[in-house]
From Swiss-Prot:
Major subcellular site: secreted
Alphabetized SMART domains for the sequence: KAZAL (SM00280)
Biological classification of the source: Eukaryota, Metazoa, Spiralia, Lophotrochozoa, Mollusca
The organism of origin for this protein: Iotyrris cingulifera
Protein's recorded name: Turripeptide Ici9.1
GO cellular component, one term: extracellular region
């Protein structure tokens, strides 16, 4: 799994309903948790 992500803040909403700081963080979380998380949309998830 890729674990080094930039700290640039370009938030994306994952298909799991969580907001990630950027797409790299989402991809890393999906890999580490062995789940299929995709980008639902760019920007924060609606709470």
């Amino acid at each position: 799994c890729l674990s080094v992500c930039s700290m640039e803040y370009w938030p994306v909403c994952g298909s799991d309903g969580k907001t990630y700081p950027n797409e790299c963080h989402l991809t890393s979380e999906a890999c580490m948790s062995n789940t299929d998380i995709t980008v639902a949309h760019v920007g924060k998830c609606d709470q």
